[in-house]
Curated annotation (Swiss-Prot):
Protein name: Imidazolonepropionase
Species assigned in the record: Salmonella typhi
UniProt: Fe(3+) binding residues: 74, 76, 244, 319
Binding site for N-formimidoyl-L-glutamate: 146, 321, 323
Coiled-coil spans in chain: none
Catalytic reaction annotation: 4-imidazolone-5-propanoate + H2O = N-formimidoyl-L-glutamate
Xref: Pfam families: Amidohydro_1
Residues the record lists as binding 4-imidazolone-5-propanoate: 83, 146, 179, 247, 324
Length: 407
């Protein structure tokens, strides 16, 4: 009989989808197991026959499914306003250029976010965060990028820090100052990149407000030379990098980010084989964002088969934002990744657990159920992991455990 220490907590009588690749079964499944949690971490996984049937801090899950906590590794959670009106305009035939000329597009969100009080932004973002938590998310990336000026970018990152301080969910904050050229720099995008590189990145990094630097390398964003300036600045300061790349065209952004050992290359609909090879060589995760693909009614799909062939880890994320992916649901993103991009359900699960953890640099502590990892996991009223992917409108979450505590 396994001896428990005072303070240990046990979840017994569970069907465990560990997502541990060292286990041979699909999803790393093992039956009739018990989890021992100690000081917020997984202490051990043992057959339930080795434990007492009942006792203090022993939870009988009656055969329910347990998975790692979900990880949403790409969101734009902090913003004000919405873009429903311009979405309706687009569906009625208005072009993106026409909408932008009227002050719409990303600059509409920038204007609303700049004008919004920090406390209001916090309350808006908190509600969104709790929606994701209700689906079993325990680690969440939050990007800035709707300020495009020092003061507002800092405001957005302070909101992310305030959310993290609640200890309801882990937050990985990302500086995305190189998201778009603000209206005041419309005729001088290089000047704006200078502001990002010489002021925003060093000052906000010194304040400890973010974990990584992101950028938008695209025909409607920043070119390769401008993007490389951002990457060089970040790397000189020892900051991890990532990038929105190859979403609408092939510019070579994935190769660029991979040369700087980027954590991830995100979107990647137009990714080519050279880019896939570069990602493999750079250890860069490919992050699929099917919500934006769906909402923009795109037709160019990411090269999933090439990513498999080159064994590039593939993550899946919600990309929750007001303009191109207003879907605050990781379950829906998993379903879309399977239906639209051809992932298997097991690949989708890997994409919101261990591969998503790698995309945030947290692969040594998050995304799997194994000894030594954080005790972040979800108990589901389900028999198989595929059920969560198959029916995204139904949430079978029974219990969410964060840092070893039921939340």
């Amino acid at each position: 009989m396994r001896q428990l220490l005072p303070g240990d907590t046990v979840w017994r009588n569970i069907r465990l989808a560990t997502m541990d690749p060292q286990r041979q079964a699909p999803y790393g499944l093992v039956d009739s197991q018990a989890l021992i949690v100690r000081e917020g971490h997984i202490c051990d996984i043992v057959p339930e026959t080795q434990l007492p049937v009942s006792g203090d801090n022993i939870h009988d899950m009656q055969g329910r499914l347990v998975t790692p906590g979900l990880i949403d590794c790409h969101t734009h959670l902090v913003f004000a306003g919405n873009r429903a009106a311009e979405w309706e305009q687009r569906l009625n035939g208005a072009s993106y250029q026409h909408i932008s000329a009227q002050g719409g597009g990303i600059n509409a969100t920038v204007s609303a976010t700049r004008a919004c009080a920090e406390e209001t932004l916090y309350l808006l973002a908190r509600e969104r965060m709790m929606r994701l938590a209700s689906e079993g998310v325990t680690l969440l990336e939050i990007k800035s990028g709707y300020g495009l000026e020092l003061a507002t970018e800092e405001k957005l990152l302070r909101v992310a820090a305030k959310l993290a301080a609640e200890n309801a969910i882990d937050i990985s904050p990302t500086l995305l100052a190189a998201h778009a050229t603000p209206a005041e720099y419309r005729d001088d995008p290089d000047g704006y990149i200078t502001l990002v590189c010489e002021t925003m990145i060093p000052q906000l990094w010194q304040k400890g407000l973010f974990d990584a630097v992101d950028l938008f390398c695209e025909s409607v964003g920043f070119n390769v030379a401008q993007s490389e300036r951002v990457l060089q600045t970040a790397k000189a300061l020892g900051i991890p990098v990532k990038g929105h790349v190859e979403q609408l065209s092939l510019l070579g952004g994935a190769q660029l980010v991979s040369r700087y050992q980027g954590l991830s290359a995100d979107h990647i609909e137009y990714l080519d084989e050279a880019g896939v090879a570069a990602m493999r060589d750079g250890g860069t995760v490919g992050v699929l964002l099917p919500g934006a693909f769906y909402f923009l009614r795109e037709t160019q799909r990411p090269p999933v088969e090439l990513l498999r062939r080159y064994q590039v880890p593939v993550a899946v994320a919600s990309d929750f934002n007001p303009g191109t992916s207003p879907f605050c649901s990781l379950h829906l993103a998993m379903n879309m990744a399977c239906v639209q991009f051809g992932l298997t359900p097991e690949e989708a699960w890997s994409g919101v657990t261990r591969h998503a953890a790698r995309a945030l640099g947290r692969q040594a502590t998050h995304g799997q159920i194994r000894a030594g990892y954080r005790a972040d996991f979800v108990v589901w009223d389900a028999e198989q992991p595929v059920e969560i992917v198959y029916e995204p409108g139904r949430n079978p979450l029974y219990q969410r455990v964060y840092r070893g505590q039921i939340s």
